[in-house]
Amino acid sequence: MTDLTTLTIAQARYALTKREFKATELTEAYLKAIELANPTLNTYVAITAEQAMKMATESDSRLARGQGGILEGIPLGIKDLFATQGVHTQACSYILDGFKPPYESTVTANLWRDGAIMLGKLNMDEFAMGSSNETSYYGPVINPWRKKGSNEKLVPGGSSGGSAAAVAAQLCAGATATDTGGSIRQPAAFTGTVGIKPTYGRCSRWGVIAFASSLDQAGPIGRNVRDCAILLKSMASFDEKDSTSVNLPVPDYENYIGQSIKGMEIGVPKEYYLEGMASEIVELWQKGINCLKEAGAKIIDISLPHTKYALPAYYIVAPAEASSNLARYDGVRFGLRVPGKDAIEMYENTRSAGFGDEVKRRILIGTYVLSSGYYDAYYLQAQKVRTLVKRDFDQCFASGIDAILTPATPTPAFGIADEKIKNDTVAMYLNDIFTVPVNMAGLPGISVPSGLSSTGLPLGLQLIGKPFAEEVIFQIAHIIEQAIGTFSTEKWWTQQ
């Protein structure tokens, strides 16, 4: 019998409706795969086996009655940033030690409504702050990919490293993730998976632990473009509990997969050609351009002049919002509490013990740029830059451009505890150079696998769309996927 964990969501969904196997069998197959792989890859921080089997049994009952939802019986991994009622939810931080929320996030509630099954909670950078999944309280996630002829452990990207690695290693059919500055698209590119950051406001943020509220957005990571389209249809919704949720109909994204892109205008921004960029990234970009040309799209050279200021502005805006959001973690009502002689000392002791180094760094930066005397010089200026970045995109799309094609990352995955990057915070932050402008402008962006590096590691291209036009970038991404193919890695962890 076929290994059920190799099936895409679309394939598994079809087979389940035809009763070729049961949801309980599919779920068991994933739980066995997790049991075998997790000690090595560290993708899950909580495995909800009992709950998963209960949900699968209920799915089988609905399927037998012909009443299944669009994700009926599909086992998913959930990033540890999403509140799951009565289940471990810690944002992979010690400060939320033991926290089990009494409520469910809107995104996960939508998935359960449509019949999906929860396998467990996925590892991530602490409070989603990181680009390598090395800041987690539970230790780093190991990328399932390896360089040719090497046993070096590589990062899966971040902050949704657990989500991307679990999908790439076939430890879930798909996964939820979040993206504040590239945290879906960068790990997807590093692991040969597909990840989409929807338009800001497309998915509800209610029940998603906040990092930077004006930038955070939930989205899926899947094995291919179609799977991501299926997942986003379920995850997206209007939600009165989220004041930034936008009340627009959610298209059936899957219907756009396979449609022609003939006549579409694809912009290629000159500012994304970075000085000293690896030649294989430039070649990959050209390969993507050629694919789209052959499919009948028009390639237009464009300029996004303020893009170069997006990253420094982001690292002012995001920490500022984080320092405000994370002030609520004080040990009083939930999570870790470290005693002190009075309330102030208790707050200090709790935060000192509970937050990791990267989170502390960003809180310090954020508090500094919001402080008296520096607010106008830093935070206000960064918000003005943000407006200019968004205006560049608006003008580009107003001129008739349908989507923009760029690389997803400046490099393939790097080593765990890479000394050069570990000791250079700016080098780590530069991993998000191609993805951050999309968050600053609130636009949708998708990362699609587009080839392998000279060392055999996945590389990705990014498509940026108009606001609430996710269906267009799904359509174009599928053309690239069809031309270049999908990529998977050997399961070396099963032979250890």
Curated annotation (Swiss-Prot):
Reaction equations catalysed: L-glutamyl-tRNA(Gln) + L-glutamine + ATP + H2O = L-glutaminyl-tRNA(Gln) + L-glutamate + ADP + phosphate + H(+)
Name of the protein this chain belongs to: Glutamyl-tRNA(Gln) amidotransferase subunit A
SUPFAM superfamilies given in the database record: Amidase signature (AS) enzymes
Primary enzyme class: ligase
EC number: 6.3.5.7
TM region positions: none
Quaternary structure annotation from Swiss-Prot or TrEMBL: Heterotrimer of A, B and C subunits.
Reported function: Allows the formation of correctly charged Gln-tRNA(Gln) through the transamidation of misacylated Glu-tRNA(Gln) in organisms which lack glutaminyl-tRNA synthetase. The reaction takes place in the presence of glutamine and ATP through an activated gamma-phospho-Glu-tRNA(Gln).
One Pfam entry name: Amidase
Gene3D superfamilies, per the entry: Amidase signature (AS) domain
UniProt keywords, alphabetically: ATP-binding, Ligase, Nucleotide-binding, Protein biosynthesis
GO cellular component assignments: glutamyl-tRNA(Gln) amidotransferase complex
Name of encoding gene: gatA
InterPro entries (UniProt xref): Amidase, Amidase_CS, Amidase_dom, AS_sf, GatA
Active-site residues from the entry: K79, S159, S183
Similarity comment: family membership: Belongs to the amidase family. GatA subfamily.
GO biological process, alphabetically ordered: translation
One MF annotation (Gene Ontology) recorded for this entry: glutaminyl-tRNA synthase (glutamine-hydrolyzing) activity
Keyword Transport assigned: no
Species of the source: Bartonella quintana (strain Toulouse) (Rochalimaea quintana)
